[in-house]
Amino acid sequence: MSAAISFGVLTSPAPPWQQVVDNWQRIEELGLDSVWVPDHFVNLRDPSLPQLEAWTLLPALASQTTRIRVGSLVSAIPFRNPAFLARQALTVDHISQGRMELGLGTGAAGSMDASYAMAGIEDWSFAERVARFQEVVEIIDQLLSNEVSSYDGQFYKLQETQMSPRPLQR
């Protein structure tokens, strides 16, 4: 069995908005398979540069394209509650008509990402980030696979969490 190679591009989420839209539409016209935005509170190289927020951009940009797959590269788990992240991904999946790609990551160490200090996000140890990542993946998988989910982990707990509508893709 062979799989086709796909090509995508990570784009800048810097304003102005219309330039971001034009870039995504041009990428789609060029025939690339996916387009991504980084999920950080600020630009990693220069926090003073303007930057729009990834999960607000994704549904807006998905509505401005028709074929290309869309996603965040990657969503760092310290920035979001896993149930809300699953709901955000589900919403983008519907707005994009099934073109959502969910990229997840443990998050960089706070010393490498000014987002933590600037937004008051706790900088977990590497071991804790990895352990939390495992729980987040399990939770999101459960939520997107079942109409009702419960989870009792070391870091996260869900009680009869309902997830409707169902994702368009799986």
Range-by-range predicted roles:
Residues 41, 76, 106-110, 155, ...:
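Short, flexible active-site-adjacent loop segments at beta-strand->alpha-helix junctions, enriched
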Residues 5-15, 79-150:
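Flexible, glycine-rich active-site loops centered on histidine and acidic residues
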Residues 4-8, 34, 67-74, 99-103:
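Structural preference for beta-strand elements that scaffold enzyme active sites
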Residues 48-72, 132-139, 143:
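Alpha-helix-loop-beta-strand connector modules within alpha/beta enzyme cores
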Residues 149-157:
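Short, flexible loop/turn segments with low-complexity composition
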Residues 1-12, 67, 109-114, 157-170:
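N-terminal small/glycine-rich loop or linker at the start of catalytic domains
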